[in-house]
Amino acid sequence: MASVILYEYPFNERIRAYLRLEYLFDRLFFFAREGDARLHQIAVSSLFDLLDASERTDIKGAVLQDLERQRMALVGLRDHPGVAQDALEAMLRDMERVVAALAAQGKTGQALRENEWLVSLRGRLAVPGGATQVDMPSYHAWQNKPESVRCADLQSWLAPLLPLHEGLSMALRLLRESGRRADIAAEQGGYQQMLAGKIYHLLRVWVDPSLGVFPEISANKYMVWIRFSTQDGEVKPQQVSRDVAFQMSLCSS
C-alpha cells in the first residue's frame, strides 16, 4: 500500500488535458513492457486513446507555449543569489533540446494515422469484442507472433509520440515543482481557501490511505473547496464529519 495517495485537480482544461495524456502514456508504457499478448492489446488500445485525446486540441502547441513561458521564468533566475547556476544552465539546455524535438514534428501521431493496418485495428477495437480472430484474423496472427516481434512493433508505433511525451512530462514537472507542500487540517471533513487573486493551474492533495477517505475537490480563480468522503463500493460516497489531516500544494508556474 502507498504511504500516501496523491490526488490532483486542474484549474483549467489545458492542464486537465495534460493529466489525461500523462495517464494514457503511463498506461501505454506499462503494458507495452509486458510480454502477454492480451496485455499488449491494452497497450494498443492506450495508443489509440492517446491519438483520440491529442486530436481534440492543439496539445503540441499548448505544450510548446508552456515550455517557452517556463523557459523565460528560468532565464530570469540567471545570476540570482541562491540559485545553482550550473543546474539552471543544464535545465535550460535540456529544455531547448525537448522544445526543438517537439517543434520539429508535424501533427502528433500523423504517421500512425497513415498506417492502414492500425487504422483498421483502431476501428475494430472500438467495437466491443470486435478484434476477435473471426473479425480480424490479421490481428490474431500478430498476437501470436513472438514477444520480441510484438514489443518491437509497439516501440516503433510509440516512437512518433515520444517528443510529445517528453515535452508534456517536462511541462508538468516544472508546474508541480512550483508548489509548496503544506500540512492542512480539514475541520469536520471540509476545507476551503481563498486564493487572493493569484492564478493557479494545479492543486495537489496528499492523503494517508489509512484514513479511508478521499477528497472531492472544486475550485475557481477565487477559492478552493475540499470535502473528504468515504466509499465502500456499495453505495455512493458519503461525506465524513471528522477532522482530516492532509497535505496540499498549489502550483502556479
Swiss-Prot record:
InterPro entries in the cross-refs: ZapD, ZapD_C, ZapD_sf
HAMAP family cross-referenced by the UniProt entry: ZapD (MF_01092)
SUPFAM superfamilies cross-referenced by the UniProt entry: YacF-like
Primary subcellular site in the record, as a coarse category: cytoplasm
Any GO BP: FtsZ-dependent cytokinesis
GO cellular component: cell division site; cytoplasm
Record key words, sorted: Cell cycle, Cell division, Cytoplasm, Septation
Pfam (any one): ZapD
Protein name: Cell division protein ZapD
UniProt subcellular location: Cytoplasm
Gene3D superfamilies membership: YacF-like, YacF-like domains
Family, per entry: Belongs to the ZapD family.
Summary of the function given for this chain in its UniProt record: Cell division factor that enhances FtsZ-ring assembly. Directly interacts with FtsZ and promotes bundling of FtsZ protofilaments, with a reduction in FtsZ GTPase activity.
Self-association state and partner proteins as the record states: Interacts with FtsZ.
